[in-house]
């Protein structure tokens, strides 16, 4: 099967102004090359002949080079980065006009990525336009790296392209139910700051710009600890850090069928970035799993476990702003042994919303009501969007939910 794109990546590209760009065509061209990279990587994993493996490796590398040098990829990256700035009102970032975006394209299309020096991102220099350029070039590399890693990531990893946090919550709902045998949850937060960088780079194989990725990994501590979470959408660091957790399902002997349905009877796993929840049938199984991860998995990758909690699901636990707990089906009848699983916004996430709203009210007391509404609406809409698929009606009905407005 031919996985090469017959047309050059930059064919028929003529841009006079930003508003004249045919975005469906740009997305189509980038997606086509990404699909070819994914297909070639899948074939590489299934191939057993060493000669054919080398040929497929060259195909993957050539396709990635084509995509990295594609101006369509650069256009899409500029649109993605600048658009995320505009819609994230919680971070004060300079707005970009169409002329600014076009000028960015004219400057970056001549940049040699091999000679680019990665920058450190923090909340103090986020308004710097050089940081914006760095994020755009990161996204150019990420678009070429994503399909290769998509072919390798396990079904339990949800922090990747095309997945959302609500998908991880939905997976938890399917794994932990009233009729399920796994009634204990092992919560683990990995500390990835001291991860073995050689292990990550070896996972990338023949990626064309390993030296640039290595430079980003050297600066991982500054980028990983930043509170400006919007960079996770376009930054290379989170997806590179996910690489060191590949093999977690193999370590736990978790096996999946053709439709990504778990067929093994042992622990079950849900992973989001550096956090994971392992569901076990007993407390002893959870303790054994934790010791196994510490002794083999973490030691080989040179990573540490920040926190590890073992809780019973009937007591409930928090995961990324949500509370997961098994409740009695009938509160009035203590003899009724039936259970139901409810997922609600956690008290901490509700408190966080109230603190953000309170800070805005205190900061803009002298401003008009319309100005204040423009500031608080994005926050309310954002949390309402993330809570819409869970049991959240009680959070809106509370008069004083974990913190009150002035």
Model regions and ranges:
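Glycine- and acidic
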Residues: 15-16, 124-128, 153-157, 185-187, ...
């Amino acid at each position: 099967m031919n996985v090469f794109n017959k047309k050059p990546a930059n064919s028929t590209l003529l841009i006079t102004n930003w508003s004249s760009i045919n975005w469906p065509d740009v997305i189509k061209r980038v997606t086509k090359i990404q699909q070819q990279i994914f297909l070639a990587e899948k074939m590489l994993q299934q191939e057993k002949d060493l000669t054919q493996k080398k040929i497929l490796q060259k195909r993957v590398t050539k396709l990635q080079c084509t995509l990295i040098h594609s101006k369509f990829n650069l256009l899409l990256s500029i649109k993605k980065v600048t658009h995320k700035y505009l819609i994230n009102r919680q971070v004060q970032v300079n707005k970009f006009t169409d002329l600014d975006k076009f000028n960015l394209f004219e400057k970056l299309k001549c940049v040699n990525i091999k000679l680019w020096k990665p920058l450190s991102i923090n909340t103090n220099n986020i308004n710097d336009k050089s940081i914006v350029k760095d994020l755009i070039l990161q996204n150019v590399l990420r678009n070429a790296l994503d399909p290769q890693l998509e072919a390798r990531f396990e079904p339990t990893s949800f922090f990747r392209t095309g997945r959302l946090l609500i998908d991880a919550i939905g997976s938890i709902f399917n794994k932990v139910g009233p009729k399920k045998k796994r009634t204990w949850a092992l919560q683990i937060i990995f500390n990835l700051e001291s991860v073995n960088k050689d292990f990550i780079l070896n996972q990338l194989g023949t990626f064309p710009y390993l030296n640039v990725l290595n430079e980003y990994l050297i600066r991982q501590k500054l980028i990983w600890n930043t509170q400006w979470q919007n960079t996770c959408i376009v930054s290379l660091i989170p997806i590179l850090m996910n690489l060191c957790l590949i093999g977690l399902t193999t370590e736990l002997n978790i096996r999946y069928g053709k439709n990504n349905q778990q067929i093994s009877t042992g622990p079950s796993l849900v992973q989001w970035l550096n956090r994971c929840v392992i569901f076990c049938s007993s407390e002893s199984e959870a303790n054994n799993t934790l010791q196994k991860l510490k002794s083999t998995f973490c030691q080989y990758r040179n990573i540490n476990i920040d926190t590890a909690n073992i809780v019973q699901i009937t007591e409930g636990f928090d995961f990324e702003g949500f509370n997961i707990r098994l409740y009695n089906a009938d509160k009035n009848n203590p003899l009724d042994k039936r259970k139901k699983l409810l997922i609600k916004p956690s008290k901490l996430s509700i408190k966080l919303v109230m603190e953000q709203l309170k800070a805005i009210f205190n900061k803009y007391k002298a401003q008009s009501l319309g100005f204040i509404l423009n500031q608080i609406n994005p926050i309310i809409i954002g949390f309402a969007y993330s809570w819409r698929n869970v049991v959240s009606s009680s959070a809106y009905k509370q008069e004083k939910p974990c913190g009150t407005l002035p």
